[in-house]
Amino acid sequence: MNKQQFIDRAEENLLHVYNRFPVVFDHGKGVHLYDTDQVEYLDFASGIGVMAFGYGNEEYENALISQLKEITHTSNLFYHSPMIEAAAKLTKAAGLSKVFFTNSGAEAIEGAIKTAKKYAYLRDGFAGHEIIAMNHSFHGRTVGSLSVTGTDHYREPFLPLMDGVKFATFNDFSSILANATDKTCAIIMEVVQGEGGIYPADADYLKQVREFCDRKDILLIFDEIQCGMGRCGSLYAFQQYGVMPDILTTAKALGGGVPVGAFLLNDKVAKQSLVPGDHGTTYGGNPLCTAAVSQVLDMFENMKLVDHVNEIAPYFIAVLDELVEKYDFVESRRGLGLMQGLVLNIPVGDVVKCALLEHNLVVLSAGGNVLRMLPPLVITKEDVDEFKMKITAVFDSFK
């Protein structure tokens, strides 16, 4: 089939909930993607932050092939070694006590919400507790995760959602205080807001929130589904701030391309929250996906990938800062590590489309006016130079 035939067949059978670009990707190698016409694209989106190693990494692929030949599913009624190994590695890496594996980031958020509510229920002896979330946040599209997503246009068609959620202003501690009540059981936030526009948390703000949560026995939930897994210059972004969460959600690059997420708990919460019968999943923690998690964590360590991010990020950031200086419609840059955004005063959707269809560059948007870059963590200076050439050509067409 040619490209248009693929697209026509997709529209016949797939529910149209994404406005997809007219490109049909066929395979990838390194930091490049190739469509069905064998056109090469530079990928600075990495499947929305998923493909940390890029495409076609043989070590990763061989680990999955090996597990496929052994066993792919048992259900959570039984133990299996890939899940046990992945749990040990992930809890150690994150500095937390227990983990529950899910199939996605949104499922991890659902588990975090349930954990916080159950913790407060056991402590107080009654339900009806509240959660403080952040304006302009994004935590997923399931009912629970959408309930704590602070972006109206995602929420409005599905109201009423879960009640007891209040929204505070990110990086404004006074807004936390204004929304907190005796019923508050948790505060949830992204350490770097992604979909909302690439806003890193302020260090003083996180410390104030942590101290407040400690005083009030409120659980602090960090959503690092997008900003975690090395992207910001540490395995998890919170590790740069010296502020520990009570609950952590993670996904995307955690599995290197297979659908897996997780929520992790500290010891206090793990001992006073979910018990058998409270939470479960048929596929979560299956042997194939947890073998992927284990392999990903091993490769992060063996490749010293976080060190590489810290080495390449300044070079990439310097290129982005040059673009801010060069083009009047590029107002500013913000971000952390290899999670970067350029604030534009021209329609960002037009820029993303032009980059893809005219210059074979895959980038993303965020927050309405931000050009978002989430390149594979393995990018080199040569890849950044290629990005610079392509994005300069894109921006020149908007002068």
Task: Label the model's feature ranges.
Residues 1-399:
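Conserved N-terminal phosphate-binding loop of PLP-dependent enzymes in the Aspartate aminotransferase
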